[in-house]
A protein has these predicted regions:
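Structured mid-to-C-terminal alpha-helical surface segments
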Residues: 1-35, 46-56, 61-214
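Glycine-rich beta-strand-to-loop/alpha-helix junction loops that act as flexible
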Residues: 37-42
Length: 214
């Protein structure tokens, strides 16, 4: 039986972030049950991850019109919502509970296919939410790694392979990705954000992914 996240995280600051994430996720889904969580936190909470992730990333075409309701509901839970900023397609805010803060990013234009999976709360309970399939999450992470070469994006791809249900839909993408794979710019960071188990090396992940894609 898996321990609750708050029992596995080693840093108090990470525990506080995890609890704040839970409050924000619950607030978002109380207002828009079609919102889609993606990115590192979605992988951590919805795909049995062991990599700490801080920010919250959503797709939601409704949340822009619900900004006032979001702020009101957040305040009722003791949260401080800094003023929303919009860049056209994206909506940004920083949210705090007085102890810690995190960034919220919402893509308010893009419509995506989603699936329902349990989101694991820090206390061990769960909440059914919408997120991306493992296959679509991998495609996003391939783009992210190709753009910035952060080790966390490569690790997320590596981790998600075990959840792929339609191998044919991403096998070619993985193979092509590996043929042009440059080393990460921050490999040493991985061991600081993996909070359980061994953090694999870049070479280990590359070999294992190539074997998977055969």
């Amino acid at each position: 039986m898996q321990l609750p996240i708050i029992k596995m995280l080693k840093k108090r600051s990470q525990i506080e972030v995890a609890r704040l994430q839970d409050e924000i996720v619950q607030t978002v889904y109380s207002l828009d049950d079609r919102a889609v969580l993606h990115g590192g936190t979605a992988i951590w909470r919805c795909y049995s991850g062991n990599r700490f992730s801080e920010d919250l990333d959503f797709y939601s075409t409704s949340l822009f019109s619900l900004k006032t309701d979001f702020e009101k509901t957040s305040r009722s839970h003791g949260l401080i919502v800094n003023k929303f900023k919009s860049t056209g397609n994206l909506l940004f805010s920083s949210i705090s509970d007085g102890r810690t803060s995190l960034n919220l990013e919402v893509n308010i234009r893009k419509k995506v296919e989603s699936i329902v999976r349990p989101y694991l709360n820090a206390d061990g309970t769960s909440l059914q939410i919408r997120t991306l399939s493992a296959e679509n999450m991998i495609l996003e992470k391939i783009h992210a790694y190709s753009d910035r070469r952060f080790i966390r994006d490569l690790y997320d791809i590596y981790h998600l392979l075990q959840f792929v249900e339609n191998k044919g839909s991403v096998k070619r993408d993985i193979s092509l990705f590996l043929t042009h794979l440059d080393s990460p710019v921050d490999e040493g960071v991985l061991k600081t954000i993996i909070y359980s188990g061994v953090s694999p090396s870049f070479e280990r992940m590359k070999v294992d992914m190539a074997r998977w894609a055969k």
